[in-house]
Amino acid sequence: MSLNVLFVASEAVPLAKTGGLGDMVGACAGALQRAGLHVTVMLPGYPAAQAQLRDARVACALPDLPGGPARVLLGAMPDTGVPVLLLDAPALFDRPGNPYLDACGEPYADNALRFAAFSHAAAHVAGGVPDLPAFDIVQAHDWHAALVPLLVKRAGRPVKTVLTVHNLAFQGNFPPRIAQDLGLPPEAVREAGFFGQFSFLKAGLMWADRITTVSRTYAREILTDAFGYGMQDVLRARRHDLVAILNGIDNAVWNPSKDAYLSRPFFAGNLSGKHAAKLQLQTLLRLPKDAHAPLLALGSRLTHQKMADVALQALPQMLEAHPDLQVAVLGCGERRYESAMAALAERHPRRMAAVIGYTERNAHMLHAGADLLLHGSRFEPCGLTPLYAMRYGTVPVASRVGGLVDTIADRGSPEAALRGATGFLFDGETPEAMAGAVARALRVFVQPRAWRVLQYNGMTTDFGWSQPASEYLALYATLAPRATPMPHLQHWPMRTLARPASPPDTAPVGKPARRRRTTALSTTARAHPVARAAGREKIRA
């Protein structure tokens, strides 16, 4: 038989998305399905998800869940056909707002109950439901599904579990007194205690058979006091079970040569369509149409993690120091940062525009039309936004943390001479460091041939899902060795992006970037000791 894998997550594109978690779950499931695995995604039954579910029918009833009876619906993704299970529990998931926050931006008061019920349902489904066989492996994503490994083991199911940590800062910590309403054994509540609270995430870290995270550098960082968010001791104890697999992006969705949101397609060998996209973006944002003005984009959540506070101090410095600079902000997050960004744009109406909110159309137009992407972050598990930007020839200026270290080759580093620079990294959390990195980038921007090499290197680097999918396959094989892999997996071709022989108009400017893909298998001179086996990297102390 082939492997049967159940993804359990709070979001997955296209059914539900608030950020990178949704992108990863949907795209990774599709990639594994193309690799020949039987992958099923289980999500809460949000109304929008149910409306998009294809060929929906009732798979089973669950009368005894915490929070009341519910049904499990079985259907398929509308785009990839990946099987989907939705927990149909209207009292828990039929609400205004997003999956986690109410219409006022506050966490739902019963989030513990909502996601405990979801985890109980997933643990039941793991044993098999009508029309679906029992699963070999259950992969839970972030704290919302982190109770699943505990509940699977408590039920005695012969299923291996993986917990993928997308962001260690989000832990699902709640008062232990509510645990009795969540259907959890008292001893588990005690063992997963976390500074006087019960932690969903800690429970997952303790009971999962393997723990994965989404970049090599972040996997090492979370073992330290600086980035461990209180979980570092648990992670150090499980370090031999910690695996780093870099996230990919969906090259079919993020494809400038076939992007329906753009007026003209473009590719690495011909950027005329990108010039058109810049004018299109300037028109949308009511900025002066100027093909020569450097256009800096900020397209991330407006939060403390993403250094929105630092950007608010650095942007006025940049606008003053660089009279031609234009700034485009697309994002949402904490209300104070949203208001401050909007106010800053109002003070510079012909230099800066801020669109508070997020749509896929605007995100595609931003990455296609901008020249540079500013991506500050105090910590960054992976960092998908710069990968989207590089795919569209937009050069990232980013913090030197987490997955950004693994995916952006800093033009100022010795390593860039070997693997081809793709952007600019800065250290620290000060406005001066951020503004200085942008200034460094702008000095290269006025050198068209050198800038073109940066764009070319980024656009021709393959950050698709082929390599990460192969690493997940290797991980699953170690967990379920008795499951027979499908024969064609050994010969599954790695997808690569088409690229011209050399960057147009840049042949004299040094050597074109060597083809690379920075993954969990990459090593650098600064890398900690690692053990690599079967296409994956285990993080050791």
UniProtKB/Swiss-Prot annotation:
Signal peptide: none
Organism: Ralstonia nicotianae (strain ATCC BAA-1114 / GMI1000)
Catalytic activity: [(1->4)-alpha-D-glucosyl](n) + ADP-alpha-D-glucose = [(1->4)-alpha-D-glucosyl](n+1) + ADP + H(+)
This protein's name: Glycogen synthase
Family: Belongs to the glycosyltransferase 1 family. Bacterial/plant glycogen synthase subfamily.
MF terms in GO: alpha-1,4-glucan glucosyltransferase (ADP-glucose donor) activity; alpha-1,4-glucan glucosyltransferase (UDP-glucose donor) activity
Keywords associated with the record: Glycogen biosynthesis, Glycosyltransferase, Plasmid, Transferase
CDD domains: GT5_Glycogen_synthase_DULL1-like
E.C. no: 2.4.1.21
Region (Disordered): 497-541
